[in-house]
């Protein structure tokens, strides 16, 4: 371990090395590249607050603060915020949020060569373009409750336990992991409306499963044939 990561303090007895593990040093930059490609291929982006989903005869419609848009088919892929829309469609999906925290130490990415996870304490540290990112913890806290400052403090203390003295952290952030009781996402059509599709609830794996979920949903909308069994991911499983 010392040969791989000489800056980790020698508190450990051993570890597991994932030889082919990969990580993105700047996920936002990758997503912006994909977004630019989407626009170049004719995609349109409107930034508005969705207030409701209703219907114009049999076509789904999105109501915003100022406009109403009517579609042939519609996808709800709003992560942890999807439940607010599915509830309005009379579909009670037990989506909750696993809130996770991160703390950012600017200019310290040179201290580690790769992501390191300390499973006993439930946190990890990743070298990013912007510095060291310390992440971890899980709490079911919904969308409205304030952040738990104690969890941020624990991340800072754990990072110093692993790496020694660190400068004052630059940034704190809390995110919402969209989670379901069976740890499977919801992918596929609404049980009540055949022209509304769902893609959410990917828990800790949104970055990993987002691309394949998008491919599956686009195939459904285009009515392509598939040999995939998607029943385990249907919203029907919740009654």
Which ranges hold each PLM region?
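Helical element adjacent to the flavin cofactor pocket in flavoenzyme catalytic cores
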Residues: 9-73
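Hydrophobic/aromatic beta-strand patches that form the interior of the parallel beta-sheet core
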Residues: 46, 75, 197-199
